Structure formats: structure tokens, C-alpha cells
Amino acid sequence: MTTESSASPAQQIAAGYNVTGQALNLGAVVVDGTVDPTAQVKIPLATINRHGLIAGATGTGKTKTLQVIAEQLSTAGVPVVMADVKGDLSGLAQPGAANDKTAQRATDTGDEWTPTAFPVEFLSLGTTGRGVPVR
């Protein structure tokens, strides 16, 4: 049996991610290029120890998604180990720079963005390089 819903498509999507308790906030739902800041996608922190897959074409936000997850896990006190061959995530060690684009994005998505640095330890798979050698 199907029922008609007066909720917007973004709200219908967000309803599937409506969780209580500690959760990671992945952000606002975007439908056809329109952001609904009241429709938030969340993952319960207790389920983050399970397997997951983040897939997509180049430029679709996979690395940014991993960064957001790592930042929120760090904030929650959960240690994170990430392999970053291309060096895309090394910026986690420094607070981001606020600018008009980040301010507008935070407004559009309903986020309260504050530049934050996170604890980072760099490891290296050899004896050369900047990181602590692993072997």
C-alpha cells in the first residue's frame, strides 16, 4: 500500500537517515541542485564500525566525504587511520581558511562552520619522506 506524502523529496530522503543519539552528520540533502538545509543525512556513531563503500566519478566528493567522516570521528574521540597516497587529506592538520565561498556554502547547507585543526600523525612506508617510518 502506498501513501501520498506532502514531504519534499529531500525530506523523504532525510527521513531514512533520521537517527537519535550520537551520529555523524554527512550534510544536507541536495535534489536537482537545490539544497534543503533542514534535510540532514546522519549515520549513527554506533554503526560506523561496519563496512562501507564510498564510490563515484572523479570530482563527486568522495575525498571530501571521507574528510568529513574523519573530522567528526576525531571530534567524537574515535581514532582514525587513513591511507592518503595522493596527499589530499594532509590539510586536516591545519584549520581551513574562511572565505566567501565557504561562508555561502555553510549558509546554504545550514552548517555552523568553524575552521578547525585535527590531530594528525603522518606515517611513511619507508625510511624516507616526512612521516614516521612504518617499516
Predicted regions and their residues:
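Short, intrinsically disordered, charge-balanced linker/junction segments flanking boundaries
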Residues: 120, 128-135
